[in-house]
């Protein structure tokens, strides 16, 4: 006889207050992070309000990109995305499309066709293989890449707050299953963050929205269409209490899919016009991706956009126009498909269109005019709410929840109830799906049921855990399998085995089984966990992450020291060659000595780009020891020689 494990229940967001206050550990300032497929965003609850924090480039959203340069430097965020076209094979993005999934997952197989970097199979999971500089190849788990993005968000918050950040609330799509949620928590651990809560993106958006809408009961529909995922949630908000009534969506629909359609259109068009297939040139495809994304954004506010790419392919330029009408035509089936989950959510919550009080649009893709029009038409002309920046709403809500967990009183009596998005059940004789937890059950939840053996003296039962709505398990999604062994010999149907499913506040499942006859209790490990990182792997990845940070620091120091020597040598060279300045004041002997010393160092630099910090420092000191006495003699003082830094400001005085 067989059973199943719980899906990705939607997280409960329980904003507890005074009763936890006494026993709460000091967690410092907890940050809220929207770890997105394409962009990430971080916020903090401070002085009674949410601050969305800008990164070092001044941007409030950061690309979820990590790159490794040929020089061995690691770039994260804007810097990584900006060099995508020149280094596509070693620029990693869309890690969220791979996290917590198995190699054989059809969506993984579909995705890797379009990713410019190499994805390989390791321990039945997709791993990312890149050249990290110096001819070294390294494979990373998707969790490690996500951890690097989380580290960037953590550092962004630390720079703003002026102190260390150790605890966070991180958001995931409502449809993420157990493995994907666990993998996201693991990414936090690797980044040195204690992820206190995993919360659903639409839930977070509802919190952001709910803060200023506190009177009476309201039905809110959250329509969240981002770069990689689509979620629809129906929430009721009553005096600060949120309840997620129903959710639906598509884990694999978003802005990137719209870009892909446009790219395919232009690749075909280019082949038709020139007979050339650009697909085989990664760099050309990435250039096109970048320009198509820009054009798509422009079309939200204008009716046509020009796509110009210099030396696009084999030295030829690319120049085409994309109209809003063409963009809509290429994606119309995808746009229309977003209405199905909206319909489903209304059916699940027994509500009519007219019962919806507010429609909240979240995610950058909801800026597309056609999407806004379809939503408005679906709700018979009702205008969606525009009170929230769609890029920041999720991080905003996560920051409010983080404020609650920090013990910040200003968030008030905010409570949020969440639900399990799919029915969870087990397989019983004949491949029947026996339901344990119906979809849209509020979590956290715990359900138990008694099962028995299917044959005489059966020592083991195999339990298969499924999620889905179909009556037969073959049509549903297998989440995991485990065995309960050591059942004493008995006729079929006699042993009583109590199986308990428990979903915690993060929507993560625990399964316990108890043989009622013997009182033997076993905690069951779902084989799904085998796709998770082991504690040892996580520890190794944490160490790797620390090592990377250390290497990044060392590399920067080395580059800075090299630059100091270089600018010092060139500054001297320029001044010696300038008759108005140092060149006109030196004796020919001193001039020759200095010129020779400077040339030696410049030649040495050209052939020793990869020297150690100590070598650069030593060479600079050697040069100073030759130059210093000459300059001192010239000025009759023991003042320091001109340095590279002084070059710009002190130049005129020499």
From Swiss-Prot:
GO terms for molecular function: ATP binding; ATP hydrolysis activity; ATP-dependent protein folding chaperone. Residues 1-18 form the signal peptide. Residues 409-419 are annotated as: Interdomain linker. Residues 420-500 are annotated as: Substrate-binding (SBD). There is a cross-link at residue 352 (Glycyl lysine isopeptide (Lys-Gly) (interchain with G-Cter in SUMO2)). Residues 1-80 are annotated as: Required for interaction with ELAPOR1. InterPro entries: ATPase_NBD, BIP_NBD, Heat_shock_70_CS, HSP70_C_sf, HSP70_peptide-bd_sf, Hsp_70_fam. The modification O-AMP-threonine is found at residue 518. In unstressed cells, AMPylation at Thr-518 by FICD inactivates the chaperome activity: AMPylated form is locked in a relatively inert state and only weakly stimulated by J domain-containing proteins. In response to endoplasmic reticulum stress, de-AMPylation by the same protein, FICD, restores the chaperone activity. The modification N6-acetyllysine is found at residues 125, 213, 271, 326, 353. The keyword Mitochondrion does not apply. There is a cross-link at residue 353 (Glycyl lysine isopeptide (Lys-Gly) (interchain with G-Cter in SUMO1)). Keywords: Acetylation, ATP-binding, Chaperone, Cytoplasm, Endoplasmic reticulum, Hydrolase, Isopeptide bond, Methylation, Nitration, Nucleotide-binding, Phosphoprotein, Signal, Ubl conjugation. The modification N6,N6-dimethyllysine is found at residue 585. Residues 632-654 are annotated as: Disordered. It comes from the Eukaryota. The modification N6-methyllysine is found at residues 585, 591. The modification N6-succinyllysine is found at residue 447. A motif (Prevents secretion from ER) lies at residues 651-654. Endoplasmic reticulum chaperone that plays a key role in protein folding and quality control in the endoplasmic reticulum lumen. Involved in the correct folding of proteins and degradation of misfolded proteins via its interaction with DNAJC10/ERdj5, probably to facilitate the release of DNAJC10/ERdj5 from its substrate. Acts as a key repressor of the EIF2AK3/PERK and ERN1/IRE1-mediated unfolded protein response (UPR). NCBIfam families: PRK00290.1. The interdomain linker regulates the chaperone activity by mediating the formation of homooligomers. Homooligomers are formed by engagement of the interdomain linker of one HSPA5/BiP molecule as a typical substrate of an adjacent HSPA5/BiP molecule. HSPA5/BiP oligomerization inactivates participating HSPA5/BiP protomers. HSPA5/BiP oligomers probably act as reservoirs to store HSPA5/BiP molecules when they are not needed by the cell. When the levels of unfolded proteins rise, cells can rapidly break up these oligomers to make active monomers. Belongs to the heat shock protein 70 family. This is Endoplasmic reticulum chaperone BiP. It comes from Cricetulus griseus. The gene is HSPA5.
């Amino acid at each position: 006889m067989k059973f199943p494990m719980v899906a990705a229940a939607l997280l409960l967001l329980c904003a507890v207050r005074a009763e936890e206050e006494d026993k709460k550990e000091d967690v410092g300032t907890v940050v809220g992070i929207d770890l997105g497929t394409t962009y990430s965003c971080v916020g903090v609850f401070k002085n009674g309000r949410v601050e969305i924090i800008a990164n070092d480039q001044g941007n409030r959203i950061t690309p979820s990109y990590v790159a490794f340069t040929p020089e061995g430097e690691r770039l994260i965020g804007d810097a990584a995305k900006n060099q995508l076209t020149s280094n596509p094979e070693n620029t990693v993005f869309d890690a969220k499309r791979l996290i917590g999934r198995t190699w054989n997952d059809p969506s993984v197989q579909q995705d890797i066709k379009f990713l410019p970097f190499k994805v390989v199979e390791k321990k039945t999971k997709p791993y990312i293989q890149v050249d990290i500089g110096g001819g070294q190849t390294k494979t990373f788990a998707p969790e490690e890449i996500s951890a690097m993005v989380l580290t960037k968000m953590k550092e962004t918050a630390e720079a703003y707050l002026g102190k260390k950040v150790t605890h966070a609330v991180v958001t995931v799509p409502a449809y993420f299953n157990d493995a994907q949620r666990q993998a996201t928590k693991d990414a936090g651990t690797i980044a040195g963050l204690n992820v206190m809560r995993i919360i659903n993106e639409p839930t977070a958006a509802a919190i952001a929205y709910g803060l200023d809408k506190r009177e009476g009961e309201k039905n809110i529909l959250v329509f969240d269409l981002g770069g990689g995922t689509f979620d629809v949630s129906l929430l009721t908000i009553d005096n600060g209490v949120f309840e997620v009534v129903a959710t639906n969506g598509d884990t694999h629909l978003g802005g990137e899919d719209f870009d892909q359609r446009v790219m395919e259109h232009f690749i075909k068009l280019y082949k038709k016009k020139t007979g050339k297939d650009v697909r085989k040139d990664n760099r050309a495809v990435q250039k096109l991706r970048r320009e198509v994304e820009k054009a798509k954004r422009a079309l939200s506010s204008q009716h046509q956009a020009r796509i110009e790419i210099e030396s696009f392919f084999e030295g030829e330029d690319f120049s085409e126009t994309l109209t809003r009408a063409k963009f809509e035509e290429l994606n119309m089936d995808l746009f229309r498909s977003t209405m199905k989950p909206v319909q489903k959510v209304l059916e699940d919550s027994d509500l009519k269109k007219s019962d919806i009080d507010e429609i909240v649009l979240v995610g950058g893709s909801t800026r597309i005019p056609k999407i806004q029009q379809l939503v408005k038409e679906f709700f018979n002309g009702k205008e969606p709410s525009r009170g929230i920046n769609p890029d920041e709403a999720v991080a905003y809500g996560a920051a409010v929840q983080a404020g609650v967990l920090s013990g910040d009183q200003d968030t008030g009596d905010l409570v949020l109830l969440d639900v399990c998005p799919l029915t969870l059940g087990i397989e019983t004789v004949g491949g029947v799906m026996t339901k344990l937890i119906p979809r849209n059950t509020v979590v956290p939840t715990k359900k138990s049921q008694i099962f028995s053996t299917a044959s005489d003296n059966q020592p083991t039962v195999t339990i298969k855990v499924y999620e889905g709505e179909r009556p037969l398990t073959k049509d549903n999604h297998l989440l995991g399998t485990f065995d309960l062994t050591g059942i004493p010999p008995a006729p079929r149907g006699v042993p009583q085995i109590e199986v308990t499913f428990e979903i915690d506040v993060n929507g993560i499942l625990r399964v316990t089984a108890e043989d009622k006859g013997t009182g033997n209790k076993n905690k069951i490990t779902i084989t799904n966990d085998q796709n998770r990182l082991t504690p040892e792997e996580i520890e190794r990845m944490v160490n790797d992450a620390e090592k990377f940070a250390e290497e990044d620091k060392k590399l920067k120091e080395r580059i800075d020291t090299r630059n100091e020597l270089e600018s010092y040598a060139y500054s001297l060279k320029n001044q010696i060659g300038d008759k108005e300045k140092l060149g006109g004041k030196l004796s020919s002997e001193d001039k020759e000595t200095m010129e020779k010393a400077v040339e030696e160092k410049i030649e040495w630099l050209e052939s020793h780009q990869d020297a150690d910090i100590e070598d650069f420092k030593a060479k600079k000191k050697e040069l100073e020891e030759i130059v210093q006495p000459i300059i001192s003699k010239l000025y009759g003082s023991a003042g320091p020689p001109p340095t590279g830094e002084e070059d710009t400001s002190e130049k005129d005085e020499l």
